[in-house]
Amino acid sequence: ARQQRGRHFTEEDTVKRVGDPIARGWWLADAVRDDDRTPVLHGSADADVCIVGGGYTGLWTALRIKELAPTTDVMLIEREICGSGASGRNGGFAMTLWHHFLLLERLCGAPEALRIARASTEAVAEINEVCKNSGIDIGFEEHGWIWTATNPNQLGAWQATLDALERLDTKVFSELTREEVADRTGTTYNIAGVFEPGLASLQPAATAQALRLVALDRGVRIHEHSPMVELQRSDPPVVRTAHGSITAKRVVIAMQCWSGSLPDLRNKYLTLGGDLLMTEPAPQVMQEIGIEPGLLVSDSRLLVHYYHARPDGRMAFGKAGGTFRPGNLVGTKYEGRSRNEEWIKSSLYAFYPALRTVPVAATWSGAVDRSMDGLPFFTRLGRPDIIGGLGYSGNGVGPSVLGGKILASMALDRLDDWSRCGLVRQPPGFLPPEPLRYVGGSLVKMAVSRKERAEDAGKDPSRLDRMLTRMAPPGLVPTD
């Protein structure tokens, strides 16, 4: 088998893993269906645009290109199946960027920050509208999001964001009383919170499958089980796979955590794991708990807890901070059952003791691409005909719609609001070379974990842990 450059798996390994969808999580096992219109790429081909990566970003980019320039020949290649990476393994949170407004404002100023955040609200609705055309039920439930605090140190984590929006005469979040938070989330573990309407829970793998069908129907050529093994920077560039090649006028890199195989991006982000579980259906228990079905809930820690009750009585529950990977090489570390299964179960039962009686249907892991400032970035990779973007930092379901708009405009050389967007920039921050990055990152992650455990226990974290925690990049919610 031909070894994929910079990675720890072969094409044969990839195909073998696809035969066991539950190894990649409950969502994928539930949603994935074969499609004979997405064959392995064999031989050479030409395209106007070649997109590498069949997750949300790649699929939205393809759809946007077809919307702006319908005659453009778009070819998309995917190493496994569309949605087999983070797009099919996440918590099913279709969120906006309003909670990151302070980061956006710092990056590009208030007017552009407002434009991007408002567009991210529209993006959530767009997911539902586009996927309706596929005939696939993506389980879209628009019940909003409660951003909570679970200990006194998290109280007011949202206040600076609310103050900044109030200064701009913009109201997005509604403050809730402690009783309202406990009543709506079904647990007294949450002691405060604010509510953002318009956000939705969904079945993430089904969403990727729906986008794949819509893209095929609109003329996008998709080849699955066709991982890129080399990007030849010739004129024009050539993307090589194990059994074929594509010569394209433009190449879009939409590989997210798998971008570590490219020198341009290898040191521009951190790969950090997330662990999730799905319970068996227990509608009676869920009714007794009292959590609103479809309501998104997450707390204010760096190693965030995030969860929602599904309409069928299941609980989807996740926690950030799993396996940390040296060199941003994903390999097979995120395949199979979660290595942190007991850890994530104990977190679930802290919130919902009644769920101890409910069997767990599956546990799994996924890779998260964290940028150094918590926001995605989109850039040209040393030349105008190769572009890429990543760094959603745990919030990619909704914002990837915007990522598709940005990358499509860049690929088509359009001068518009998206190609000039504030998120079009050089990768932020600085990461030291390996092995310093892995050692330093591991120390920071352990410090964050110790700090948050101490806060949960009502104790003061050590001064060293506080200092190291400040070095961690933002995750789902902003940090001080």
Question: What role is predicted for each listed range?
Answer:
Residues 13-31, 100-106, 129-210:
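Flavin (FAD/FMN) cofactor-binding and adjacent substrate-gating region
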Residues 92, 125, 133-141, 228-230, ...:
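Active-site substrate-recognition segment that forms the wall
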Residues 163-166, 189-249:
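Helical element adjacent to the flavin cofactor pocket in flavoenzyme catalytic cores
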Residues 89-119:
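Glycine-rich active-site loop/strand segments that organize a redox cofactor
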Residues 410-445:
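Active-site-proximal substrate-binding core of FAD-dependent oxidoreductases
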Residues 66-89:
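Glycine-rich FAD pyrophosphate-binding loop
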Residues 53-57, 79:
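Glycine-rich Rossmann-fold phosphate-binding loop(s) that bind the pyrophosphate
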Residues 4-49, 67-68, 72-73, 99, ...:
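Extreme N-terminal leader/targeting segments of oxidoreductases
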